[in-house]
Amino acid sequence: VLSDNDKTNVKATWSKVGDHASDYVAEALERMFFSFPTTKTYFPHFDLGHGSGQVKAHGKKVGEALTQAVGHLDDLPSALSALSDLHAHKLRVDPVNFKLLSHCLLVTLSSHQPTEFTPEVHASLDKFLSNVSTVLTSKYR
């Protein structure tokens, strides 16, 4: 559960991410594909090379979903219901991949926002991304 302080940290950090969300997520996806090659199996039709337009487009989709989630911190299940259905029933993504992408996104955010990325902010963002992952995998059961 996100505390009020966590919510403040997440909103403040995401507001600083701003228009860079899609770029940061695309970078995190590239990092994930490189660091965890098994994640590539869900994207057989993508060019996964550095700077790929397909990875950037997917980064934009994920960035928009995270921005929507930040706007609905008190009701993530409703805000992410359609995405949860998609990932559980159509795409059938292994739930561990959400954790891997979350980790790569934290690394990416810390590299772009080193001053703002305090231990407290790190913990808040980690909790937020964990909650998003939990919601996205909730319909797997």
From Swiss-Prot:
Residues bearing the modification Phosphothreonine: 8, 108, 134, 137
PTM-bearing positions, type Phosphotyrosine: 24
Residues that bear N6-acetyllysine: 16
Organism: Loxodonta africana
Residues binding O2: 58
UniProt entry tagged with the keyword Cell division: no
Modification sites for N6-succinyllysine: 7, 11, 16, 40
Residue numbers carrying Phosphoserine: 3, 35, 102, 124, 138
Assembly mode: Heterotetramer of two alpha chains and two beta chains.
Domain Globin: 1-141
PROSITE patterns xrefs: GLOBIN
BP terms from Gene Ontology: hydrogen peroxide catabolic process
Keywords: Acetylation, Heme, Iron, Metal-binding, Oxygen transport, Phosphoprotein, Transport
Assigned protein family: Belongs to the globin family.
Binding site for heme b: 87
Function: Involved in oxygen transport from the lung to the various peripheral tissues.
A GO cellular-component term linked to this record: hemoglobin complex
Protein name: Hemoglobin subunit alpha
Residue spans crossing the bilayer: none
Paired cysteines (S-S): none
Tissue spec. comment: Red blood cells.
Family matches, as Gene3D superfamilies: Globins
MF annotations from Gene Ontology: haptoglobin binding; heme binding; metal ion binding; organic acid binding; oxygen binding; oxygen carrier activity; peroxidase activity
InterPro entries: Globin, Globin-like_sf, Globin/Proto, Hemoglobin_a-typ, Hemoglobin_oxygen_transport
